[in-house]
Amino acid sequence: MKEHKEKGVDLGLRQFIKSLGYVAGGTALLATTPWLTSCTPEKLQEIKHEKARIALIGTGSRGQYHIHNLKEIPHAQIVAVCDNYAPNLQQALELCPDAKSYTDYRKLLESKDIDGVIISTPLNWHAPIVLDALAAGKHVFCEKAMARTLDECKAIYDTYNQSDKVLYFCMQRMYDEKYIKGMQMIHSGLIGDVVGLRCHWFRNADWRRPIPSPELERKINWRLYKESSGGLMTELACHQLEVCNWAAQKMPESIMGMGDIVYWKDGREVYDSVNVTYRYSDGVKIAYESLISNKFNGMEDQIL
């Protein structure tokens, strides 16, 4: 399946608002997407006002993308925005001038006037903010990837299971109608057994953003450094590997791979080229490749 737009993001965001009890429907989608079990009634508490009161934590390009989408959802109200980088926070306030502003997400979470938060921060902040938000009694919609380390993912999973709150992660394909329909066909046996999976994602991009001063390099270009990023595997591959596991209806049992900095030799720490093979227990394999120095073959997910 080739994908060039992100309609699934908007659908996922709308489904998050639905899960808070503000929009009727969604039953058919729920039946075919079991990861949406976070919006079952036992995970919800009655909210006694007309709109879901949403706060944005992280208001860079991704956070502002969500702001624009939220403005199209009549049952959502942006009540607060938070960022510790002043230019991003100011841009968010220009988009939603009635929202309260914060530079410390912990202060935002103390507010009793917030039902849910949308987290669009660098990856290394996902786990602490998700955990703190659930502890504060907020519903959570978080950008991918779930977290930077496996231990952080496990901590989030355990905390969510002990909470009564909704938790979504923004994996676009999981909410995309094309992928949902395709998986229905695969799982029904219509096109036979899954015997192999191949995915690639090729781009021409250095991931580098301009910085106003050198001391902001690691803050603004966080995707390039290991303490804050998993590189191509967490920024791109996570989308496609999720599709593979969805198609196979299982998780791989082993993995081998390699990565290198082949082209962008500019001081970055994460690889700009990766090749990885995953193996399921039945011998079916995923062949995955990604690089950001040649976009000729674009992006594709193949279920064989």
Q: Which role fits each region the language model picked out?
A:
Residues M1-Q15:
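N-terminal secretory signal peptides
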Residues L20-C96, D176, C244:
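N-terminal Rossmann-like dinucleotide-binding module
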Residues G58, R62, Q162-F169, R173-R268, ...:
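Predominantly a Rossmann-like dinucleotide-binding segment in NAD(P)-dependent oxidoreductases
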Residues K100-D104:
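Conserved SAM-binding strand-loop segment of SAM-dependent methyltransferases
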Residues V117-I118:
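N-terminal Rossmann-like NAD(P) cofactor-binding module of classical short-chain dehydrogenase/reductase
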Residues P122-L123, A127-Y175, G189:
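Beta-strand-loop-alpha-helix segment that lines the small-molecule cofactor/substrate pocket
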Residues S281-K285:
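Glycine-centered tight beta-turn/hairpin loop motif at sheet-sheet or coil-to-beta transitions
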